[in-house]
Amino acid sequence: MNTSPRTLKTIAILGQPNVGKSSLFNRLAKERIAITSDFVGTTRDINKRKITLNGHEVELLDTGGMAKDAFLSKEIKAFNLKAAQMSDLILYVVDGKSIPSDEDIKLFREIFKINPNCFLVINKIDNDKEKERSYAFSSFGMPKSFNISVSHNRGISALIDAILDALGLTKIIEQDLDIDILESLETPNNTEDGNNEEEIIQVGIIGRVNVGKSSLLNVLTQKERSIVSSVAGTTIDPIDETILVKNQKICFVDTAGIRHKGKILGIEKYALERTQKALEKSHIALLVLDVSAPFVELDEKISSLADKHSLGIILILNKWDIRYAPYEEIMATLKRKFRFLEYAPVITTSCLKTRHIEEIKHKIIEVYECFSKRIPTSLLNSVISQATQKHPLPSDGGKLVKVYYATQFATKPPQISLVMNRPKALHFSYKRYLINTLRKEFNFLGTPLIINAKDKKSVQQN
């Protein structure tokens, strides 16, 4: 336990791999600093950050997960235990969707002996129904635990209050923020339009190895920032470059090429983790496809990254000057294989001949405007009402299904809630119909639309 005279309090985030430590670190720091992924042992180093919690500056430490089979596990565990001893408070994070293991309990008790100033933080409790899962963690022997969901921003404010109380810091109220309303929005993206800071459009360039991503970055920025080579996998770390188009800043990130999992070895695995991090903070993805040869299955799998991260998307058909087939055949194949991206604009290009490069820049701005669009509530409800009248909602076991009203609660990407009497009865096919209707009425070029249904009673209670 830390007994030094310094005034800056230190908080260490500990726990097994892949339980959400880095995500919690990012949430508390209000930045995406630590790499977060599904790989065990993603965080290899200590991430240290001075942050402000309700007006108080503290030091936050995110440490590597301590699994027996993890890389450098003994060294990481020893370093973690030392961090626990030196910290003023420990946040021990567990996965609320998993059953606690004997190893996890043993590790927690070992840390608790070193420093009893310890909170048990049960992550991934995404809604009230999942709270009962937290009872399984009573075996840790903590009289009080904290149920949170980092991805849904639930329970974070209560945890922060408890942290400040444990550290002997008085809460400073900076603004009148309705925390309850913020936490009731069960979505990781709660972006509002009222940000006065200058927005930089973040664009991730994705694709298989050697399809021309680095060449595209070079011609877009007119710089030789990326090494261009015929050797697959030349780009390891994401390389970023900012340009100005129509007084709008655009930051391009050239990510490592993606190949089949069976071929991913050593540093390429690290590169993929960095690619995931780059996409997490991107607004738009440029999916680069090599048309000098037919599309492959991996192209389709990579395209799903844009959907996974809810990004705007533009399809770039590179090496058009040496395309393998006529225009009509390539476009027909593209439409068939990438049917779920039919809303994405398509641009043919040749980096060697700088074909359509300026068009790509202007299309990015157009897609970003759609990505940031907010539909006036009255207009949105008018369109939804007309759509449900034209094609009524299917009944639910013979009972009438109604949409009372719709509201757009977020942008980047646009997210819409339908307040209904029977939200579970909203079939995915009808949701797709509503999305297509909105696309026809409003220009959502290259932009994913997210629609969810909420029960009227729960909305009224909230």
UniProtKB/Swiss-Prot annotation:
Alphabetized UniProt keyword annotations: GTP-binding, Nucleotide-binding, Repeat, Ribosome biogenesis
Cross-referenced Gene3D superfamilies: 3.30.300.20, P-loop containing nucleotide triphosphate hydrolases (3.40.50.300)
Domain EngA-type G, first and last residues per copy: 9-171, 201-372
Domain of life from the UniProt record: Bacteria
Pfam families reported in the protein's UniProt record: KH_dom-like, MMR_HSR1
GO molecular function, one term: ribosome binding
Binding site for GTP 2: 207-214, 254-258, 318-321
Keyword hit for Nucleotide-binding: yes
Subunit-level organization: Associates with the 50S ribosomal subunit.
HAMAP family associated with the record: GTPase_Der (MF_00195)
Function: GTPase that plays an essential role in the late steps of ribosome biogenesis.
Name recorded for this polypeptide: GTPase Der
Organism this protein belongs to: Helicobacter acinonychis (strain Sheeba)
